[in-house]
């Protein structure tokens, strides 16, 4: 009987030590400086889904010499720049469509790949849209981070 208590005690001690010494690999949305930059709840949901899959987008990236910001920016190791936009109802209006068209043209001319996902598509099949986005990102050279000590450069 004493042996059982010794084994149980050692197991508990090793478990507690493992919890203390092992770095957490889980994403904590309440402790993320990029997440707070998301403009709305749907962007936060997309951001959370990407982070849970270990992708690190830059949120609200300010395009140099322009007045607009990108919902999510990714920079591939191969030099490709990727703009992921989450489009709400405004983007379906004639004014929004025209503005997005001009913006997309500018971005593509300046070396960016633009990916747009509508709120309708996300609301009708969120996980499917995230899986499609992840597949596109992988195809373009963006892969999940394998580093546990990932450092994000903050943009001013």
What are the functions of these language-model segments?
Residues 1-57, 144-156:
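Solvent-exposed, charged helical/coil patches
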Residues 59, 115-117, 146:
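A generic structural-conservation signal
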Residues 79-139:
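Basic, amphipathic alpha-helical patches used to engage nucleic acids or provide basic targeting signals
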Residues 40, 63, 98:
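Conserved phosphate-coordination/catalytic loops
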Residues 43, 60, 85:
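Acidic-residue sensor for enzyme active/binding pockets
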Residues 51-81, 95:
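Active-site metal-binding core of divalent-cation-utilizing nuclease and nuclease-like domains
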Residues 42-43, 68, 100:
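Amphipathic coiled-coil/heptad-repeat helices and related helical stalk/stem segments
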Residues 46, 74, 103-107:
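Hydrophobic side chains within alpha-helical segments
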């Amino acid at each position: 009987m004493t042996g059982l208590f010794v084994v149980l005690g050692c197991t508990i001690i090793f478990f507690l030590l493992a919890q203390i010494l092992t770095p957490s690999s889980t994403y904590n949305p309440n402790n993320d400086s990029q997440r707070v930059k998301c403009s709305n709840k749907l962007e936060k949901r997309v951001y959370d889904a990407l982070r849970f899959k270990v992708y690190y987008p830059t949120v609200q990236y300010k395009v140099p010499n322009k007045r607009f910001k990108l919902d999510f920016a990714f920079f591939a190791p191969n030099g490709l720049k990727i703009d992921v936009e989450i489009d709400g109802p405004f983007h379906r209006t004639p004014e929004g469509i025209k503005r997005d068209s001009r913006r997309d043209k500018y971005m593509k001319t300046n070396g960016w790949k633009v990916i747009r996902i509508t709120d309708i598509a996300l609301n009708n099949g969120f996980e499917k849209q995230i899986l499609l986005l992840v597949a596109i990102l992988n195809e373009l050279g963006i892969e999940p981070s394998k580093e546990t000590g990932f450092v994000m450069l903050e943009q001013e």
